[in-house]
Amino acid sequence: KTMPRFWTDNGFYIEMLWLLSIGIMLDYEDDLIHGLVQLIKDREAKDYIYDTLIRYRFPDWERTTNQVLYPSPYRIAITVTELAEQDKAEAVKRLEKYLKKEWYRGHSDLSWHDDHKYGINHDGYWCFESGALVKVLGLDDSSLKGLPYYPYDMVHWNDNICLLYTS
């Protein structure tokens, strides 16, 4: 409820990215995702990753741009998406490199970077957008399981539930 009062595409970009990503991974109800989408639309936030995630849930959503608002570190989403169209295995390899070498370093300017070193409350570092991209692009993420920052369990939270209903 407070997000509409404070959110701007520049001010809280990563928070919106995380909310959309978590919503995709956990199969949030469309009305919850729609609230985020409406905020993006109202603020005219043009971002490739937002568009990619939104189109997964709302296929009629028009892509607004082929750019990301923050190229460093997020331009990787464009690369992974383009690779997935040609070779899904290569897309996973590129995502793996991003998780291992680029994601954490690419966020060194954010306030939560290095929180674990200061003895304050810390709930981990998670690259939620990587899990959402895996789901949206239909990638096999078995090689990403156990990698730092990759939310494998969140991507697969309902695998066993689905098996129960299909058995």
Language-model-detected regions and their locations in the chain:
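Eukaryote-skewed repeat-based solenoidal scaffolds used as protein-protein interaction platforms
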Residues: 1-111
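Conserved small/polar residues in nucleotide/adenosyl-binding loops
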Residues: 165-166
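Detector for Asparagine
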Residues: 10, 66, 121, 158-160
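C-terminal structured interaction module
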Residues: 98-154
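Short alpha-helical "patches" and their helix-cap loops
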Residues: 32-42, 142-160
